Amino acid sequence: MMALLRRILTWPKRRWRAGGFGIHSPFAFAFVTQVLAKRNIDGNEAELRAIAGRNYRQYALLYRCVKYFKPQSVVIYPTDDATLTRVINLAEPESRIIADGETAIPDMTIITSDEGTERDNGAAVYFISRADKEPRGSFKARMASECERGMDFSDYRTWIMCRFKHLPRQSFKIVLK
């Protein structure tokens, strides 16, 4: 009885000290700690809050992803979303937003609407918000099943797929902040 009580009382301290050591891949650990678990955005918070409005948390996560991956070219859906464009330019001014029909394969694809869920454009990184809604949910499932290498990170609303050839195929279900 005493051992059970001791385990119950020391559980919060053990949980606090665990600190994410269950993630063994260096890429996954760095991505989770520097992008997904981080709350601040290093200096541009006021400007991002002015751009994002009510959707600050989602756009802050997107900002951190763009800042982390530093994509040269980005495809966004919907293509005329001024807020997405401003967030990308704030995070990485050197990124070029391209149309989906261009021959170049984008480094990153961001989907926040039902546009763009018809086909895979070959991007190394996919960021899909509201992935729990159709047709984005079925697109996410199709992408995950067809991908042989890479990692995906998701919670109940957002899905981030990193398709890099050097990564093993793994899925992480975590709370995105």
Kindly give the residue locations of the regions a language model identified:
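A short alpha-helical cap/connector motif
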Residues: M1-I110, D114-G122, D132-K177
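Short beta-strand/loop segment that forms part of the nucleotide-sugar
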Residues: Y126-S129
